[in-house]
């Protein structure tokens, strides 16, 4: 469990018991970024006492660092966390193979596609189609990079049977693997790629396949029973998260300040504040917009999903995961739920934007 003062406990130290403090329900989140820094400000800024978005809803958040979405799935299954990010390409096969896995996607927190294809500047890879038969770097073997590659190649009528997926980690190790030609491409999230650039590795970004580029990247999944039993807490959680996301998008520097005030141990010790701020702006240069819905999205509600996008994910996953009966095994109407979304969006968005623009930590 990662509290605001202690980032040292392992997942194995957790117990599956609800946490309460002065009438506030503390909900544990699987942090698949694997690092607790201001990248999480789109959630954590609302914990600042001047904002108190979570306490106003009688909830709070604790982070549990994970190495992958696969680990987050396992932690949800064993009730070690209350909610966690989930990619359709990982969630759908799990639901098909384990019918008793009663998870539901309730909040789309990355409504744009935050996946990227990175190569060395001089690489011959110019499009997603060129990934076929190549050595693909991924953060680890449980990372969505594998599913993402399979999905794009399937869209383009290609197979990945000759691709080699190589775990290269994050940051410096990933950069070294790219620089030393251990992999031909790195398929990862926007923030992970930015961290590789920060260690000095030069990258060129290759466009995603057209259809895949139009879908969201990640949802938050919760156990269905927990959703039923603690519905009010989850509404409050996601409303506070929506407010925090809008706040961070409206004033990223203020969100950094709020995050560092709440989690002072996460502030880099080897950098000046200006250096830390500049670095974090670079990490979130693309992610900042991926938090928000596209302007042409007909549903502008924070967290909303659509039946059409989940049916599309099922169709693609059936092919990439070699599960031809997936549409029969997983009901698209049940894998996600918008039941909380109207209540989640019941807040004054202009007031949050104004609050962000005028925010001072002290």
Q: Model-derived features: where do they sit?
A:
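Conserved C-terminal helix/tail region of periplasmic/extracytoplasmic solute-binding proteins
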Residues: 307-362
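Short helix-initiation/N-cap motifs at beta->coil->alpha
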Residues: 63-74, 163-176, 180, 191
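Flexible hinge/capping segments at coil-to-helix
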Residues: 120-136, 227-232
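Short, well-ordered beta-strand elements
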Residues: 23-38, 59-64, 134-137, 166
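Pocket-lining segment of extracytoplasmic ligand-binding domains
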Residues: 173-273
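Extracytoplasmic "Venus flytrap"
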Residues: 26-48, 78, 141-144
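N-terminal export signals
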Residues: 6-22
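Secondary-structure end/capping motifs
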Residues: 230-325
């Amino acid at each position: 469990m990662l509290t605001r003062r202690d980032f040292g406990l392992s997942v194995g130290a957790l117990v599956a018991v609800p946490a309460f403090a002065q009438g506030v329900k503390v909900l544990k989140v699987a942090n698949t970024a694997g690092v607790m820094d201001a990248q999480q400000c789109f959630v954590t800024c609302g914990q600042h006492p001047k904002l108190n978005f979570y306490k106003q809803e009688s909830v709070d958040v604790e982070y549990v660092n994970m190495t992958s979405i696969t680990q987050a799935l396992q932690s949800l299954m064993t009730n070690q966390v209350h909610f966690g990010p989930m990619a359709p390409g990982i969630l759908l096969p799990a639901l098909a193979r384990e019918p008793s896995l009663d998870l539901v996607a309730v909040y789309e927190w990355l409504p744009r596609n935050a996946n990227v294809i990175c190569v060395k500047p001089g690489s011959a890879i110019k499009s997603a189609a060129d990934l076929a038969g190549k050595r693909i770097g991924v953060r680890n073997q449980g990372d969505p990079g594998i599913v993402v590659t399979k999905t794009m190649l399937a869209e383009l009528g290609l197979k990945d049977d000759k691709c080699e997926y190589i775990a290269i980690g994050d940051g410096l190790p990933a950069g070294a693997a790219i620089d030393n030609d251990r992999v031909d491409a790195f398929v990862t999230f926007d923030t992970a790629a930015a961290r590789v650039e920060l260690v000095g590795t030069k990258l060129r970004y290759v466009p995603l396949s057209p259809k895949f580029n139009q879908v969201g990247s990640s949802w938050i999944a919760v156990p269905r029973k927990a959703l039923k039993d603690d519905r009010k807490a989850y509404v409050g959680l996601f409303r506070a998260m929506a407010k925090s996301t809008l706040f961070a998008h409206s004033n990223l520097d203020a969100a950094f300040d709020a995050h560092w005030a709440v989690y002072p141990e996460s502030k880099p010790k080897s950098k000046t504040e200006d250096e830390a701020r500049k670095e974090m702006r670079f990490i979130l240069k693309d992610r900042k917009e991926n938090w928000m819905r596209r302007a042409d999205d007909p549903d502008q509600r924070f967290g909303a999903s659509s039946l059409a996008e989940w049916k599309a994910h099922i169709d693609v996953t059936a092919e990439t995961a070699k599960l031809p009966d997936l549409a029969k095994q997983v009901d698209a109407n049940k894998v996600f739920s918008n039941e909380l979304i109207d209540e989640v969006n019941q807040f004054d968005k202009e007031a949050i934007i104004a609050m962000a623009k005028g925010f001072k930590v002290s």
